[in-house]
């Protein structure tokens, strides 16, 4: 398939705010894609490169050849070029990578160059996130969307699922092919996510099931982990399905000692002090990211688990939470997250207050009769924090003045628009320490795309957790809302911009 066809569809998707129209355009493209190209096409319309990292930075895209007159690039050749770039290492690799990029862009038309720039920078912004692409795969294959989503949950990726569904002779064969994707110990599953509520009472009201007892978990201030155990072999994955097994030997040893031969557990890992209180999140995040043996030895991470997806040959994804917790208690023992089972909101509120006093983030209120809805913000999990917080994306940043002179300080905050792009909600420099100012100055200069007299404009990649006292109507920002007394809590390097809170979530919090 020509890259020009993908670029044309990307433009069509960007040109409409209608989710149905976006879905139809992508489905039409997928129907036309040859089987060998489907995985590449799916990645490109979702705004991603299959290689994830190619070594090309934004500055590499500033001085490239002009566009070609006629389209000639095949998506398979483009994918092979990016794969070759990703494999380059050692002396001379930067020069070789730049030469390969120049050759690729010289063969691309203006429309194709725009697509390639968006893929390399992660800034395609046409509103075709993975969930929409999965729905388009379902349309193209003529199968129910839940079948596709379930297969992608187990596969941990959209590409193989799309290829299997679209290669089938018809809808019945496609459903059969999709049913072949099952939970496999050793292969990461997309994690279930929680919706939000402003308080415990509201969380109870949102859950299905009426007066049935719920499970109230302490929400730990750590990093999300998913562990897979097959005998003595243990693998540890992050929220984004990155394999960090080699960086966390202490977690591997803890899981290896659990009394089960095969396990898939969902949980959190965090560093704790001598009194058992969580250390600052940035320390936990830095520890999980380091490959430095001395740093790793100086601070250990402790795993705590809140769900069990598989135990000794028994898949539990479709089992109700109460059954999964029974198995979890039997296999994970002291590594189980503290929880309360109750139908009394007042008791849950007391539990929430105690968790916050102990330095934790809050609680997650869970319906006990629901399955594990991997890859989705399921209706069965509702998180509650002691303050209003949002995970937003930094869109630009201003140079500081006074004590903050010389540092990039005042950050512009945006919520994700499901239709594409970001909606600005305000600015803040509140809550920033000197250490944070120094770190973000270096980080944001790496993300710079342009600048004017006052601000440095960024690739929208850095997620930041913001606390605020409320939301107010505002004509100053395009979303019609602004944050009141916004302040920085921490940078969330464990989250991508695609996982940031949406403008719809913000409007719900504002009561709109």
Swiss-Prot record:
Transferase found in the keyword field: no
Catalytic activity: ATP + (deoxyribonucleotide)n-3'-hydroxyl + 5'-phospho-(deoxyribonucleotide)m = (deoxyribonucleotide)n+m + AMP + diphosphate
Cofactors named for this entry: Mg(2+)
Positions bound to ATP: 217, 224, 239, 268, 306, 377, 383
Disulfide bonds: none
EC number(s) reported in the record: 6.5.1.1
InterPro entries: ATP-dep_DNA_ligase (IPR050191), DNA_ligae_ATP-dep_bac/arc (IPR022865), DNA_ligase_ATP-dep (IPR000977), DNA_ligase_ATP-dep_C (IPR012309), DNA_ligase_ATP-dep_cent (IPR012310), DNA_ligase_ATP-dep_CS (IPR016059), DNA_ligase_N_sf (IPR036599), NA-bd_OB-fold (IPR012340)
Claim: Magnesium is one of the keywords in the record: yes
PROSITE patterns: DNA_LIGASE_A1, DNA_LIGASE_A2, DNA_LIGASE_A3
Stored Gene3D superfamilies: DNA ligase, ATP-dependent, N-terminal domain, DNA ligase/mRNA capping enzyme, Nucleic acid-binding proteins
Record Pfam families: DNA_ligase_A_C, DNA_ligase_A_M
Superkingdom assignment: Bacteria
UniProt keywords, alphabetically: ATP-binding, Cell cycle, Cell division, DNA damage, DNA recombination, DNA repair, DNA replication, Ligase, Magnesium, Metal-binding, Nucleotide-binding
GO molecular function: ATP binding; DNA binding; DNA ligase (ATP) activity; metal ion binding
Function of the protein: DNA ligase that seals nicks in double-stranded DNA during DNA replication, DNA recombination and DNA repair.
NCBIfam families, sorted: dnl1, PRK03180.1
Family annotation (PANTHER family): DNA LIGASE 1/3 FAMILY MEMBER, DNA LIGASE-RELATED
Family the entry assigns: Belongs to the ATP-dependent DNA ligase family.
Name of the molecule in the record: Probable DNA ligase
Species in which this protein is naturally found: Beutenbergia cavernae (strain ATCC BAA-8 / DSM 12333 / CCUG 43141 / JCM 11478 / NBRC 16432 / NCIMB 13614 / HKI 0122)
Annotated gene: lig
């Amino acid at each position: 398939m020509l890259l020009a066809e993908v670029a044309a569809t990307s433009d069509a998707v960007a040109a409409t705010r209608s989710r149905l129209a976006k879905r139809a355009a992508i489905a039409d493209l997928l129907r036309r894609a040859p089987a060998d190209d489907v995985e590449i096409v799916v990645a490109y319309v979702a705004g991603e490169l299959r290689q994830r990292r190619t070594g090309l930075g934004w500055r590499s895209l500033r001085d490239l050849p002009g566009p070609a007159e006629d389209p000639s690039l095949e998506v398979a050749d483009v994918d092979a070029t990016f794969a070759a770039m990703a494999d380059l290492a050692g002396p001379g690799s930067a020069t070789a990578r730049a030469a390969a990029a120049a050759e690729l862009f010289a063969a691309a038309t203006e429309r194709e160059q725009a697509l390639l720039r968006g893929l390399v920078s992660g800034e395609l912004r046409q509103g075709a996130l993975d969930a929409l692409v999965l729905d388009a795969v379902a349309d193209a294959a003529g199968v129910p969307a839940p079948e596709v989503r379930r297969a992608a949950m187990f596969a941990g990726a959209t590409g193989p699922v799309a290829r299997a569904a679209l290669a089938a002779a018809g809808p019945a064969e496609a459903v059969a092919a999709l049913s072949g994707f099952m939970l496999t110990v050793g292969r990461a599953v997309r994690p279930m996510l929680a919706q939000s509520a402003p308080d415990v009472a509201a969380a109870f009201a949102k859950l299905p099931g009426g007066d049935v007892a719920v499970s109230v978990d302490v929400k730990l201030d750590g990093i999300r982990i998913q562990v897979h155990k097959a005998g003595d072999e243990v693998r540890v994955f992050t929220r984004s399905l990155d394999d960090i097994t080699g960086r966390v030997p202490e977690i591997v040893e803890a899981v290896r000692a659990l009394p089960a031969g095969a396990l898939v557990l969902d949980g959190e890992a965090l560093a704790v002090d001598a009194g058992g209180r969580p250390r600052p999140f940035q320390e936990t995040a830095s520890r999980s990211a380091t490959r430095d043996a001395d740093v790793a030895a100086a601070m250990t991470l402790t795993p705590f688990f809140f769900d069990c997806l598989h135990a000794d040959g028994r898949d539990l994804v479709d089992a109700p939470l109460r059954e999964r917790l029974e198995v979890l208690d039997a296999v994970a023992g002291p590594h189980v997250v503290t929880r309360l089972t109750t139908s009394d909101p007042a008791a849950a509120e007391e539990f929430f207050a105690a968790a916050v006093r102990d330095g934790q983030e809050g609680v997650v209120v869970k319906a006990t009769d629901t399955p594990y809805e991997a890859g989705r913000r399921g209706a069965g999990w509702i998180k509650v924090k002691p303050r209003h917080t949002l995970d937003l994306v930094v869109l630009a940043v201003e140079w500081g003045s006074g004590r903050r002179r010389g540092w990039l300080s005042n950050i512009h905050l945006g919520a994700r628009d499901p239709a594409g792009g970001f909606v600005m909600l305000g600015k803040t420099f509140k809550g920033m320490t000197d250490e944070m100012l120094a770190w973000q100055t270096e980080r944001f200069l790496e993300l710079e795309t342009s600048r004017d007299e006052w601000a440095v404009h960024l690739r929208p990649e850095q997620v930041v957790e913001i606390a605020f006292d409320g939301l107010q109507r505002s004509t100053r920002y395009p979303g019609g809302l602004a944050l009141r007394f916004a302040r920085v809590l921490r940078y969330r390097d464990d989250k991508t911009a695609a996982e940031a809170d949406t403008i719809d979530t913000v409007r719900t919090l504002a009561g709109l």
